[in-house]
């Protein structure tokens, strides 16, 4: 949150405009990825919300900025947090504004266990065929609370595709439509996996 000094839009010299300050903060955040983090480290910093004001002729008193970061390393996560607050503080100080900075550490990286991942892949190949299963996918920057379970017990997190055709698109897209034809494939996968693990030979 950036706290300035609101006032009439026709008299900006009497205000400390948090909108102007906020845009400079957002712009400066992007330099963290390109100039402060090792380019060999995958990292995403996305600003997704900017809220402030409710009248066209009034400069608001404050704005709220929200977003998320994604990376695979706790060290990089801490680096992002520290640098984001430094940038926020320095820009706000330069313009005479105050700020409130909050950084929530939500989910760690989801890292599959080797044996469980291999088993998951074999079961999927048995059901759908080898050409339909990607055993070495590009790491995703998406987050998943299943990561906490993998920190405690060995396991594997998999994706079951939605297929092609109408409604086939990435998650969080308003055009998404679940493909019911994939239900038997998903159900068969879980049955096969459970039977294999619970069989007498295993």
PLM feature spans:
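Metal-dependent amide/peptide-bond hydrolase catalytic core
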Residues: 19-202
């Amino acid at each position: 949150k950036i706290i300035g000094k609101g006032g009439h839009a026709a008299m900006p010299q009497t205000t400390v405009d948090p909108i102007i300050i906020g845009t400079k903060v957002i712009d400066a955040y992007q330099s963290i990825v390109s100039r402060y983090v090792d380019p060999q480290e995958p990292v995403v910093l996305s600003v997704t919300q900017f809220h402030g004001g409710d009248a066209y002729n009034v400069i608001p008193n404050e704005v709220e900025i929200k977003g998320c970061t994604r990376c695979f390393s706790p060290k990089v996560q801490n680096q992002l947090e520290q640098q984001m607050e430094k940038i926020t503080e320095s820009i706000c100080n330069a313009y005479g504004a105050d700020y409130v900075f909050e950084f929530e550490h939500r989910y760690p990286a989801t890292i599959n266990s080797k044996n469980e991942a291999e088993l998951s892949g074999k079961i999927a190949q048995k059901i759908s065929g080898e050409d339909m299963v990607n055993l070495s996918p590009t790491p995703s920057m998406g987050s998943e609370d299943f990561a906490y379970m993998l920190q405690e017990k060995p396991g594997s997190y998999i994706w079951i595709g939605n297929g092609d055709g109408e409604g086939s698109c990435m998650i969080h897209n308003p055009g998404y439509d679940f493909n019911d034809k994939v239900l038997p494939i998903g159900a068969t996968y879980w049955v096969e996996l459970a039977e294999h693990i619970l069989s007498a030979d295993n």
